[in-house]
Curated annotation (Swiss-Prot):
A GO CC annotation given for this chain: nucleoplasm
Ranges annotated as biased composition (Basic and acidic residues): 780-796
Protein name, UniProt field: TATA box-binding protein-associated factor RNA polymerase I subunit C
Source organism of this protein record: Mus musculus
Region annotation (Disordered) ranges: 662-683, 703-836
UniProt keyword annotation of DNA-binding present: yes
Highest classification ranks of the organism: Eukaryota, Metazoa, Chordata, Craniata, Vertebrata
Compositional bias segments (type: Polar residues): 738-754, 803-828
Function: Component of the transcription factor SL1/TIF-IB complex, which is involved in the assembly of the PIC (pre-initiation complex) during RNA polymerase I-dependent transcription. The rate of PIC formation probably is primarily dependent on the rate of association of SL1/TIF-IB with the rDNA promoter. SL1/TIF-IB is involved in stabilization of nucleolar transcription factor 1/UBTF on rDNA. Formation of SL1/TIF-IB excludes the association of TBP with TFIID subunits. Recruits RNA polymerase I to the rRNA gene promoter via interaction with RRN3.
Amino acid sequence: MDFPGTLRPSLFKAGPLGMTDGPDLSFMCSWRDALTLPGSQPQNCKDPTLSFAKNLLWEPSTPGPLPLLMPPDPDPWDPGVTAQDFLFRGGHCYQYQSQAVLDVTEQLSRFLWDHGDIAFAPLGRLMLENFRLEGNRGYSKKMTIVSAKKLLQDLGGHQPWGCPWASLSRRLRRFSIVGGPVLSRSVSLLMGKLLHEELAMRWEQLLMDEAFTGGALAWLPGRTARAGQLVYPSGGALDKLYFQEVSVTSGGNPRILENPGHVQLRGPVRQVVTSTVQGETLLAVRSDYHCATWKIDKQGPPALLQVMQVEKGATGISLSPHLSGELAICSRSGAVCLWTPQAGLQTIYKDTETLAFRDPSPWRWADFTAHPRVLTVGDRTGVKMVDIQGPPGCGLLLFRAGAEAACQKGERVLLAQYLGQPGQTPPSLHLICTQFSIYLMDERLPLVPMLKWDHGLPSAPLLARLLPPASPGHPRPLLLGGQGGQLQLLHITGEGTSMPQLAGPPQSLPSITESLSAFPLLEPKKQQLLQERLEAPVIGLAAVPLCASAPGLLLFQLSAAGDVFYQHLRLLQASSPRKVPEQATAPSVDQVSTPSWTPQASARCSRWLEDLMELSPTRPLWVAPTFSHRRFLGHMERQKSQETMPQKLRAAMAKGQLLRPGDLSTLPRAEPPPAPQCSQQDELTERLTEAWEGRVTAWWRRHRGETSETQTQSKRPKRRTQLSSTFSSFTSYLDSPDASSAPRSQDLSTSEARLQSPRVPPSQELTQEVWGQGVKRERRQTLRDHTDKLPLKRDTPGPVATPPSQASSLQTMSFRQQTPVHSGSQPPQKKPRMGF
């Protein structure tokens, strides 16, 4: 823990520059001005690795990474919202490609819930005279009246200006003119402010997604040096943690041993960390609101140790390189917790404010140091060392994004990683990554970077891996991975008391997008799908040093789509320290042979592409979002009803869904309970019975005689003449003194028994009263007395034999009862012959 020999201890300051009892150095713009040492370094401090470090060069075996596994899951991968979906510049052009739809349902529901007084207060003003909510279809010539019904139909496909699908109708223009002063602008102003904040947050998330800081891919060593396990998430939601057995061949190519095992989680996997202490390997996984720890057994499946829930959301985890089982967890609330198998979970640090200056980001990070009881806590403004055994608030600022490190304006901390490794003398170096530079900090010299280098990556470097040297005496490789898939390889020298330095120029490695040339040429739409798949953000990085005669590295990369790619790097023979003299220079790019695609690599890419095309369905065309659900629901119900039962069964079997009885056909309606039996058959009982069974409307129509009226309405004009003559014949028959009353009574009773039911409906009683309208005044009383004496019911419902001579009288009586004839409707007719 001594100071490096190349630095003079008198230059060490106990605090920030300009804040100590020493000379005032606050006027200096950077630490370079304060640490300029005259003279040369001592001869005994010369690093032997610098003599050949400039000749280090790693050569990839292929022009780009190759897919290791087949497309993992049948769930289609959605690339999400891109920068082109937020920005629209230039004129309108027809879109041949499907676009992402910005779903603001969650944001709108939060707005209505949080600001309901502002959102719903102006709606009462729609009842004024300027708006017609549900009016007639008549055309209104008044330009100051807006139809709300037509307006809602226009809003169903409306998009604001600046969108390629924008449209503005006349009614919307009138609504803007009339509704502006009426509805006020409080809703639009508040909604615009919240929408601007949401778009700014989405834009920052596109530039840098901090959820996958640290990487979600890890390598677990196996029983041999050439075998191990890859731990990575997969699936459409990245909620399945896979353990894939991999072995490395003598040529440096990975080989899959068996089908991977997986663990189903409740959320997407954001970070995977491994650590081996005293022969015991632990695995820690971070999700959005949960963290879990497993103990890895080389002979059996992993054993779960603990699952912890983080209420405010976890931002980072780290495993201790000193004590087995220690896990540091950071949350968005500003708290840092330490979990151990013996003591459980305990809070060691909590501060809602940032370290150096105010920054709105809730991101927090924690890692271990060379001392087992000292941790580093970082945010966007700096990194602080905290002693967990000391009083609360005790600590020392290790790095600050400011003038001490010569930071640029707007530069923020993205990653803070401890570079110590178990089994060796623990160094005191820490890696600090920002969006512009990387810094190497020494715990013994806070606030003063040992090394600063501008990496120049176009995307945020959220992944970093420090590897052991390829051979004894070689510098240690440091891999930097950007979120966009860019890779850079650095070499760091400096052990013991020597200062850390960069050995040789940094080297850029091929990215996943450069593997597009290995795939066969496809149709434009499929080619675009493949290109989007290869351009997916990289969320995981792992490296395995190869123990072979020729030093090499095997790199694994995990994309956001769940695809794992690998790449083999080999160290050029000219980089050996034994064969290259001190004056030698690095081989130029022209001298290095350009790698080409081998037939085996092309065949692997073709097989992977075939599986991808089978699993990737065609995305639906973009349609404008609608605010009205009436038409949409009707269309969906009609489309669902047209599907047959075999089609539903095939679709369910293809998706692996569970079918319910209601999915195949309509559910059977529950039968109403049986109506109670009643012995008394009267009008009230029948009406209650029909109402209990739900047929009261049909009973009422039958009761009023509407059913018989509709059946005889078509025959009424044809029978009018016959019925009129029959009524006249019946009247003359009653006036005839030759006819006796007994046969008439028998004929009428027989016709009543045949044509009527056991009870007399009120309709027939009304018909009997109407008979008197067609009879003269002096004969009405006689007809009424005769009809009152007629029997209404018969005990024997069977048919009664009638002599042939009475058939004409029976037919005449039946027709007379059914059709009344109003007086004065037709002139009096002569008495027909034979009584017909």
